[in-house]
Regions:
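A short, Lys/Arg-rich alpha-helix, primarily the initiator
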Residues: 1-16, 20, 24
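Residue-level signal for the short linker/turn that defines the boundary of a DNA-recognition helix
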Residues: 15-16, 43-46
Length: 196
């Protein structure tokens, strides 16, 4: 169960309005709306304790469980020339150790990363970031197209390299990186494959 579900369930069972619920918890109405809209789940310890008393449950456990659910945001091309699809396909629950390594999953289409053991329909777990070290596998936005590639920096060039010899590497100058634009949007932390 997520925090917003817990709050709305309590609100309903006690016949409270959003305003009354916010007052009961001791927060502003705008903060309460952020909580029930899922925009804010990082709560101060004092608020977690207050919520636990009001709701008569262990809110900290609910928040830990919620933090372990990671969305599958759509598809990314292991190749070039595919629009980034931002539809939420579902959620995957991760163990506590893995949950903190990243932010979301993307489903891979294409075969350009098979040399790195990333195959069609695999799920890559991505840590949202704007920079990666040379040699890392990253999600890269080229204009409005997302791709997964190894990223290298050499002699003022950004090189996007497939790990399948049938695909050529792409080389971009700093000017092209700014003009196109080309942006790193995430670091691939690990691959998940379902055998169903």
């Amino acid at each position: 169960m997520q925090l917003k579900e817990l709050l709305l369930q309590y609100e309903s069972s006690h016949n409270l309005s959003h305003i009354e619920m916010a007052e009961e918890i001791g927060i502003s109405l705008s903060t309460y709306y952020r909580w029930i809209n899922g925009e804010s789940t990082k709560l101060k310890k004092s608020r977690i304790e207050r919520l636990s008393r009001v709701l008569e449950c262990d809110v900290e456990s609910v928040l830990e469980e919620e933090d372990r659910l990671k969305p599958i945001l759509g598809k990314v091309k292991a190749g070039y020339d595919l629009w980034a699809d931002q539809d939420v396909e579902g959620y995957i629950e991760l163990g506590q150790a893995d949950a903190h390594k990243g932010d979301y999953f993307l489903r891979v289409t294409g075969d350009s990363m098979v040399g790195s053991h990333i195959y069609e329909n695999d799920l890559v777990y991505v840590q949202q970031c704007s920079q990666v070290e040379s040699g890392n596998i990253a999600i890269v936005l080229i204009g409005e197209e997302a791709t997964i590639k190894k990223v290298y920096y050499k002699n003022d060039l950004m090189i996007l390299e497939a790990s399948n010899p049938k695909y050529e590497s792409k080389f971009y100058t700093l000017k092209e990186v700014n003009d196109i634009p080309i942006r790193i949007i995430g670091l691939v932390r690990f691959v998940r494959r379902d055998f169903v």
